[in-house]
Amino acid sequence: MNEAIEKRISHRCFSKEPVRASDVLQIKKWTAEVNEESGLDIEYLADGSEAFNGIKKSYGMFSNVRSMLVMKGFSDDETLDVKIGYYGEDLVLKMTQLNLGTCWVGGTYDSSSFSVPDGEALVCVIVFGNIRKTIKDVLIRAVIRSKNRKSIEERTVADAKLPEEVINGMEAVRLAPSAVNRQAPTLRYAHGQISMDGDASFKFNLVDLGIAMRHFEIGAGAGNFELKNGGLWTK
């Protein structure tokens, strides 16, 4: 998974070649396992392109969007956004290992295109597909990869020197996707305890928190977070 973290960047333009049937079956299997474990209702769509027809906003134009995961769950679950980020990013990294391109999409789509059962909430979608490899796409990816990333010091509050495994975890957090590049989740190290929290005033900060928690666990090579704002990390 560490290699997938290093490799992953956001892709908004895909080739017209459909995702291989064997990869689709694997993604469906992973999604079912995640739903069983988490209580989420993540839905695979072979063609959700209708939601992106005519969409061109601040994140740039999407092209050849078809396959996606619709990220939803029970609306009365106070930890829904954190869970969506955590389990969704686990799926993103697994799809990266399949050499597929992925992108978290928070608002640049027509939400009315999706079916959401009563009692559930649509949080976001993850689009994915085969990576388009034009010169323009290569240049765009170079710009994305070079985006300014906050230092570990800017994203931690600590009362002592950070252990090596925590530093490794935070290096992985620095490579996590973040809504409008806010990089908001903060790690706190106090009295030997580790927790992570995010400012809930912005809609997608708690999704980012779940994403960051999963990256930290992989980078640290051990432990699990409580999946909530301010959740503790235990080994």
What are these regions (language model features)?
Residues M1-K235:
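Acidic, surface-exposed loops and disordered segments
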